[in-house]
Design a protein with these regions (language model features):
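N-terminal beta1-alpha1-beta2 module of alpha/beta enzyme domains
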Residues: 1-72
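Flexible, glycine-rich active-site loops centered on histidine and acidic residues
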Residues: 2-20, 81-135
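Short, flexible coil/linker segments at or flanking structured domains
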Residues: 25-28, 60, 75, 90-92, ...
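Structural motif
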Residues: 43, 75, 105-107
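Catalytic metal-binding/acid-base residues of hydrolase active sites
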Residues: 46, 77, 109-111
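Glycine- and other small-residue-rich loops at beta-strand/loop junctions that grip anionic moieties
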Residues: 52, 76, 125
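Short, basic, helix/turn surface patches
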Residues: 66-74, 101-103, 132
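Active-site nucleophile and cofactor-binding loops and adjacent substrate-binding regions
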Residues: 74-82
Length: 135
């Protein structure tokens, strides 16, 4: 069996500055390696304190320099919201920074509010997702 930790970057504590929430989340992520976890995952969400991590590749890049054995995974890169070539470039760089420890997960996204904020019709999700996988 393998064990993993999912970073959601939730700010559930009223009055806690977002910067402190991010630092706390990163400290927990670093501890997962010390505790023997196999993988540390990061979600991608936008525009809501439920999960405040608009760029999970950036968050994992930070961890790449702070860890040495734990795998680092995207849970997930939401393809309809990202340009496929930029996703490939960013993941290539992250994989190099973490010496091949990257686990790449993709998704379509599920929150209508996120689609609306990006100005994307949610009905386009499947087509955008499929097109990104082919590109």
């Amino acid at each position: 069996m393998q064990t993993g930790y999912l970073m959601l970057f939730q700010n559930a504590h009223e009055g806690l500055p977002d910067v402190d929430m991010v630092k706390n989340e990163m400290r927990l992520a670093e501890l997962t390696e010390e505790c023997g976890f196999d993988v540390c995952w990061s979600a991608e969400h936008h525009f809501d304190s439920y999960s405040m991590v608009p760029d999970n590749v950036q968050a994992l890049s930070y961890l790449a320099g702070r860890t040495s054995t734990i795998k680092l995974g995207t849970a997930a890169v939401i393809l309809p919201w990202n340009t496929p070539i930029r996703v490939a470039e960013k993941l290539s760089m992250l994989d190099a920074l973490c010496d091949g420890r990257l686990v790449f997960g993709v998704g379509r996204g599920l929150a209508r509010t996120e689609y609306e904020s990006f100005g994307i019709d949610m009905e386009e999700a499947r087509g955008r997702f499929d097109e990104a996988l082919v590109d």
